[in-house]
């Protein structure tokens, strides 16, 4: 009887021990949970998650926030017992809101793969946001029209190709001479309309302003400023004046023009140049009456007259930074890093990035052939990979607020119409920057 009791007790003990051991193993299973920003990519991320699970056995949960609700969704999800292990921020300003949840990624392969390490969101303590997709912008030109210009016997410049145009002085002489030959070139203006319809001026108050801000930050060796000197304001004025004075649309009529109008003017051959990014190719190709061939759509850096700009590249950056949740378990953090390194390092993952997500990758694990198959994206990759060129970072992610951008855009249009002088534009911009940055600091103190 005693022997039977010992056998039964032994079996019971093993069963209980097995249950607790099993539970312990289950609790230690690593998980990956990605809070996706873009609804249009939701299905693709689900496919990626299934492919990763099939290959590794690790489950990846994907939750996609509704359009315009990412921050609200992140606040809700990150407070839960099983929060996202991967989430997105849009730059240094956003990092300040979420820095208590961002793991240092400086020791990861993912960070070491970055072609431009300075693109990461980082400080003296570590790396906290890694760009997972990049885009680039500059001056898009129609090389077919440019070749017509270079063949003119009456032109005043001696450029043989756009390769010879590598600073602002050369660009200005080219553009101003082209404006004297509009009829011969069959165009209505060198540049497409400098759009100032409501909400359509982001190319100037954000993308163009990025250049003087980038150069000021670089000169001072800083990543942000509470007060901006706007020390490169003359350089901004150089290129902005060139745009508005050599456009197909009179300065006083720009309030009626949209970005779509500008792209149509370029696509239909009415103009030779337009400032925009690689995302514009799909728009150009779809426009009714498009006359621009893929092989003729090319990029030129936005030259403004800064010393040494002959080596300047395109403005390349992102508003999409991936972060690993530092309050997740260490196992979950490591699993999430492994997932990202599979996505951007394995053949299977890279194919999803290029073919399904359509991303230009910021990592050196991708070859030129593994970039999206459109002419502008390919040129962004080419500029990124050219070690002789210095990429202009997207420092506009540090701009203090949307209100700052709107106010600067309004000042620019008043300048276009002759209702204010340039000095007032500069002073207004500096005051707006300082006041909006001060509000950010106050908000930061309240959120602590």
Regions found by a protein language model. Name each.
Residues 89-147, 296-303, 323, 373:
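Hinge/lid segment of periplasmic solute-binding proteins
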Residues 124, 128-132, 137, 169-225:
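Extracytoplasmic/periplasmic solute-binding protein
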Residues 106-114, 157-163, 195-198, 213-238, ...:
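Short, solvent-exposed loop/beta-turn-alpha elements that line the ligand-binding surface or hinge
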């Amino acid at each position: 009887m005693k022997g039977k009791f010992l056998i039964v007790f032994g079996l019971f003990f093993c069963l209980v021990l097995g249950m607790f051991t099993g539970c312990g193993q289950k609790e230690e299973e690593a998980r990956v949970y990605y809070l996706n920003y873009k609804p249009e990519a939701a299905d693709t991320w689900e496919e990626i998650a299934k492919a990763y699970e099939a290959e590794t056995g690790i489950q990846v949960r994907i939750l996609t926030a509704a359009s315009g609700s990412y921050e609200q969704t992140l606040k809700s999800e990150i407070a839960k017992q099983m929060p996202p292990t991967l989430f997105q921020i849009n730059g240094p300003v956003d990092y300040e809101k979420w820095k208590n949840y961002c793991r240092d990624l400086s020791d990861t392969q993912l960070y070491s793969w970055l072609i431009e390490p300075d693109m990461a969101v980082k400080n003296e303590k570590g790396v906290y946001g890694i760009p997972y997709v990049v885009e680039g912008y500059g001056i898009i030109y129609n090389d077919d029209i440019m070749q017509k210009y270079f063949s003119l016997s009456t032109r005043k410049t001696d450029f043989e190709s756009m390769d010879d145009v590598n600073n602002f002085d050369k660009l200005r002489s080219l553009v101003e001479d082209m404006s004297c030959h509009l009829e011969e070139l069959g165009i209505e203006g060198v540049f497409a309309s400098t759009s100032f319809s409501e909400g359509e001026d982001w190319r100037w108050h954000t993308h163009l302003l990025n250049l003087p801000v980038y150069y000021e930050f670089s000169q001072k060796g800083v990543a942000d400023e509470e007060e901006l000197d706007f020390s490169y304001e003359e350089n901004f004025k150089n290129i902005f004046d060139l745009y508005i004075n050599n456009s197909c649309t009179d300065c006083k009529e720009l309030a009626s023009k949209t970005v779509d109008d500008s792209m149509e003017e370029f696509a239909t051959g009415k103009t030779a140049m337009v400032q925009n990014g690689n995302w514009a190719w799909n728009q150009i190709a779809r426009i009714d009456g498009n006359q621009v061939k893929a092989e003729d759509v090319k990029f030129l850096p936005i030259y403004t007259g800064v010393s040494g700009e002959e080596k300047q590249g395109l403005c390349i950056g992102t508003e999409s930074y991936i972060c690993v949740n530092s309050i997740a378990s260490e196992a979950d953090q490591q699993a999430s890093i492994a997932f990202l390194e599979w996505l951007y390092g394995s053949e299977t993952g890279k194919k999803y990035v290029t073919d399904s997500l359509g991303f230009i990758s910021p990592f050196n694990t991708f070859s030129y052939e593994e970039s999206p198959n459109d002419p502008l994206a390919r040129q962004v990759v080419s500029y990124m990979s050219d070690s002789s060129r210095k990429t202009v970072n997207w420092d506009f992610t540090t701009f203090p607020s949307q209100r700052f951008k709107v106010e600067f855009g309004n000042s620019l249009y008043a300048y276009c119409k002759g209702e204010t002088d340039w000095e007032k534009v500069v002073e207004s911009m500096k005051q707006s920057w300082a006041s909006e940055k001060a509000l950010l600091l106050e908000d930061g103190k309240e959120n602590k």
